[in-house]
Amino acid sequence: MAADSDPESEVFEITDFTTASEWERFISKVEEVLTEWKLIGETSNKPPEKGEYTSGVWEEKGEEVLFADFRFSIRHHYLVQKSSEKEEKEDTGEDSIPVCMQDLLCTNNDFPPVAHCLVRWYGLREFVVISPGANDAVISESKCNLLLSSVSIALGNTGCQVPLFVQVHQKWRKLYVGECRGPGVRTDFEMVHLRKVPNQYTHLSGLLDIFKSKIGCPLTALPPVNIAIRFTYVLQDWQQYFWPQQPPDIDALIGGEVGGLEFGKLPFGACEDPISELHLATTWPCLTEGIIVDNDVYSDLDPLQAPQWSVRVRKADNPQCMLGDFVSEFFRLCRRKESTDELLGKSAFEENGKEGADISQALSKLTEPAPVPIHKLSVTSMVHSARKKIRKHRGADESPLNNDVLNAILFFLFPDTKSLDGSEAKPSTSTGNISSQSESEDYNLYSQLKSAPSNSLTYKLALCLCMVNFYHGGVKGVAHLWQEFVLEMRYRWENNFLIPGLANGSPDLKCCLLHQKLQMLNCCLERKKARDEGKKGNPLYSSSESSVNKTASDLLSPVEADKSKYEVAKSWDSWSDSEEEFFECHSDTEELKESGQESARKAKEETKENPSPKPEGRLHQSGNLMLLNSGEPLYIPVTQDPAPMTDDLLEEQSEVLAKLGTSAEGAHLRARMQSACLLSDMESFKAANPGCCLEDFVRWYSPRDYIEEEVMDDKGNKIFKGELSARMKIPNNMWVEAWETAKPIPARRQRRLFDDTKEAEKVLHYLAVQKPADLTRHLLPCVIHAALLKLKEEEAAEDIPSGRKAIKQIISHSSKVLRFPSPDDKKLEDVISQISNVEAAIARARSLKAKFAIDRCEKSEEREDLEKFVSCLLDQPEVPIIGAGRGAAGTIIHKMFVQRALTLAPVEEEPKRSSSSDDRRQTSGTDFPSPAGRELILRTSVPRPAPYSKVLPQRMYSVLTKEDFRLTGAFSSDTSFF
């Protein structure tokens, strides 16, 4: 009992009976949303400026509510307006009406070209819409009335003065009913939607009767009704107008007629007219009842006399554009899985392996009876001899590319094949072109996109592969051309011919990987040629090399020995300078090989025995620097260039170094691996400066690590005394260790830091195993680069400001996407889609310029006006015509519609209105066809429902088209005593 009497043990259950039903909960939730959005109470905003509904910023926010298990979406639409402090301080007063009622009478934004349908029908700047969920609809009349009652209660409880609409029936009908409440006033928003139009409502007089009967004004003398009328005419048939785009001759291209194909030039333009319709709106913005006649017998509404004309164009949906299709088709190759061998059959490389091996063996040339010096070969035979290997196993008819097209492409890619002098043909000239264009902004675009310079071999190859894919056999044609390209690369490597269209020097890491690989191959060729030429022309050749030459001469006749001297030097270097390169030698060259190795060993032993060898490998004296120990001048040595690297090699090297870990042993090994170039430079320095010390090397190699101080000697003279920096004095310093290990060996006798033979074979193997899909991914940045340059070129010819802005956005977007090694396919598709959109915009500009005959305009002022008009048509949803039907653009448009009206057959007229429309047209004397749409806005202010009620705005909007008829009304009434 004591526990039961304890007040803390008592539990009270509180039941809220105020929201007992689902309907009341729904109303409560709507009120909560309105309160959360701060739509409670009065609002005071300045009247909207003219055209603000179109140029202003519209925003919306939404929330979801439930009515039992039925989901509704509440969305608040409003025009963003800046209110001044003066307007915020103003008191609205008791007699003020809600802002939405004031908007009903505002004429500044009638017929906005782009707006929510409720904005166009009622002229509102702010409203809330309650609509059913995604696939639901409120169809029954009882549910519609229930929702409307909920809206009315929520507005009354919250004091919200923003109009609230409910969407009913199927969503495609866009049927809304709603209400707006203010202090003592209310506006009901109603709507009628019909498919068949009664004849009496097809003209102004019939609509005035509806409006007046709906208002039910008790006054005997009705105030005048203000009227705004707009007729819209649609021009769809453009066949009689010139379409400037000339499509390519596809039959000629497919048939292999090279004359119809210009390599390096991308196609551009739309294959169909990108402008599908032109809409002319003739507007009478401010008319008064009684000053105009428009009934079923006669009409004063002549479009030529309309004070306002405006035009909009309807764009074709996804017009077929050649540049976009070109790039898209190339991008689709990324998804192919086949290899080149699967597409073309077994490669001829394996079956001709022995032949290729014989060519690659440099020493075998010594035993040939009549060797031909390489530098005397004609480059003209490159393409033909390389392709013979493939064509032995594949007939000409089976090749995806015919001979004419293939020859044209290869001559375009390798212009030096036309030269009879193969040693110094045109690679140097192509390099000059590259350097001369380096200042251009468009030229430097490749560094942003990681593609290749626009006049490089890689860039040209991308365009040719893209063209072959589009016009000549698709993926098989691409595989065929790539196979020929790889053969050409191997031929050039084996015969010491530089690759044209590539800049000198190390691979440019700002370019795509394929371009870097080709540059690497060219680097190998340059090193190989420079080494061979240097050995051939150097009279002070080392004893080991001289003995090799002598041995080789003994094996041949005197005449043959002279011819093969250059060959021997090249061959000796190809196998003796690298410990990792071995070549199979014939039996008659084993003696030569042993002799060469023995000579090399003797040279090394002599170096060890002689502690003070003669200086070797000097480049030039280094200013006034002297050796610290001997006082001799310090000479800069001839050093080996560091090994060029590509992106994949750098990544591979980074992975290897990272796997060494963070231990002391790993760090030491990592430092040893990275100091190969340092050790080579130290050996070259020791050979050029006998008797030098580490301090001498640091003074030349890293001056910041040698610190000099000004001190006084015993005699009081100022002298400079130097020492190594602190980091050079660290125990077990890698520099000290490398210096102690280094031997005085000049660069020409050192082991090569960069084995050009090995690296070239790596590149050639890398090229040979590329599938068409891999090749496409490598070259897609180049194709996008070319497409952007084409867009810039075409836009400059048309001068489209919006086009320039769009191109800059594409470049910015592309540079972010293509910087990654493996870009996402979806992002690449977005870039290609943006390119197609800009191409379509430029094609639309050309179409409009052709239709308005701007090129044939003789007056400069009139021409400028038309160009400005066309530019506005591309950027703005609707453009007013200066001078209406009497202006330059208006006259041209009038002629278009007159021609259209003359070609229309009577059966195309609307059956139910043909007689009245024809009669009224003949009466008014207009030569325009019947309008495709008629819009009317009727406004007035009357007391309602009693004569002594407050004068409130009334509005009705009507739109009549061939498909349907819609009436929307906003009728206000005084609720103070009713």
Curated annotation (Swiss-Prot):
Subunit structure as annotated in this protein's UniProt entry: The Rab3 GTPase-activating complex is a heterodimer composed of rab3gap1 and rab3gap2. The Rab3 GTPase-activating complex interacts with DMXL2. Interacts with LMAN1.
Domain of life: Eukaryota
Coiled-coil regions, chain positions: none
Record keyword Cytoplasm present: yes
GO cellular component, one term: endoplasmic reticulum
Major place of residence: cytoplasm
PANTHER family, alphabetized: RAB3 GTPASE-ACTIVATING PROTEIN CATALYTIC SUBUNIT
Sorted UniProt keywords: Cytoplasm, Endoplasmic reticulum, Golgi apparatus, GTPase activation
Pfam families: Rab3-GAP_cat_C, Rab3-GTPase_cat
Protein name: Rab3 GTPase-activating protein catalytic subunit
UniProt keyword Iron, yes or no: no
